[in-house]
Amino acid sequence: MTLSIIICSYNRASYISDALTSLYVQSSGLDNFEVIFVDNNSTDNTKEVYAQWRQTNTNGQFTFISEMQQGASFARNTGAAIAKGEWVCFMDDDAVATTDYVKNIIKHIQDQPFIVGFGGRIIPKYIPAEPKWMSYYVSSLVGNFDYASTACAFENGKYPLESNMIVKKSVYDQIGGFNVNLPGVVGTLRIGGEGKELFYKIIALGHTIYYDPSICVHHVVEVKKLTSEYMYRVASGIGRGEKTRTLNISNGAYLMKILEYLLKFGAAIVLGIKYILQGTPAKARPVIQFRVDALKGLLGK
C-alpha cells in the first residue's frame, strides 16, 4: 500500500464527517490508501458520529482507534504505529481534502522517487466570511499556508504544516516520529512546533523537504471562535513550543530565538503602522498582538 492518511481528532464531532467524506470520494479510488482515524480521548460524541458515518460509507480501508494520552503528537504517533502504507500523511479533523488530493500525492511520489518528506497548500474556509481584521500574517494562526505557486523545495528553514504533510514511513520511524514533549493541542493548552522539529530532524539527515500546491486541503475556520482568548492560545502555543524546542538544543539557541522574536515584534509594530496608513486599521492590532502573545509563550513558564 502506498499511503496511510492519519486523522487525529479531539472533540470535533461536527467536523469529522466532512473530513472523512472528502477522502472517501477521492478521484484516485480507494484501493491505494487507508485512513486511520485516531480519537484522542474526546469527551463529545466523536465515536458515535464516526460509527454512523462508517455505516453508510462501507468501502475502503478505514480504521478507528483511540489514544487516551492527550496531545496531537501522541495521537499521530499511535496512528503511524499501525500504518500499512509506505508513506504516512497527516490531515486535520477540520480539513477537507480536494478531490485529487490522493492522486496528486501519489503523482508527487512517483515523479520524485528520491524524496522523503513534503507538504501542500492549506486554504482557510471562513464561516461565514473572512473577518476584516484578518491579514496574511495573522492568517497563519488559522492554518493559511501557500508557500509557492508551483512545486518546489522549501528554503530558509521553511517546512510544511502538520495539517497537510507527508513523510516516508521508514524515515518517520528512523527519527522517532513526533516529539511528545511538543504535544500540540492538549485540551486548551497548546505547545506547538512538533511538525517543525520533525522536519528539522529529517533535514539534519541530509534530506530536502518539498512543497506541492496541488496537494491541497481546505481548513474550516468558524469566525465566531476566533476570540482574543483563542488567538492567544494559538500564538502563545507557538512561542511555548519554540522555548521547549530550542532549550533542548542549548541555552544559546533559546536566547537567539528570544532575539528573533523581539525583532519580529518590532517588525509587527512597523507593519501595524503601515496598515493604519493604508486605511485598514482593523488589521493593525491583531498583527501586533500575535507577536506579543507569541513572545509571552516563549518567555513564560
Q: Which role fits each region the language model picked out?
A:
Residues 67-83:
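Glycine-rich, basic loop-to-helix element that forms the pyrophosphate-binding segment
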Residues 12-26:
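Short, well-formed alpha-helical segments that are part of the catalytic scaffolds
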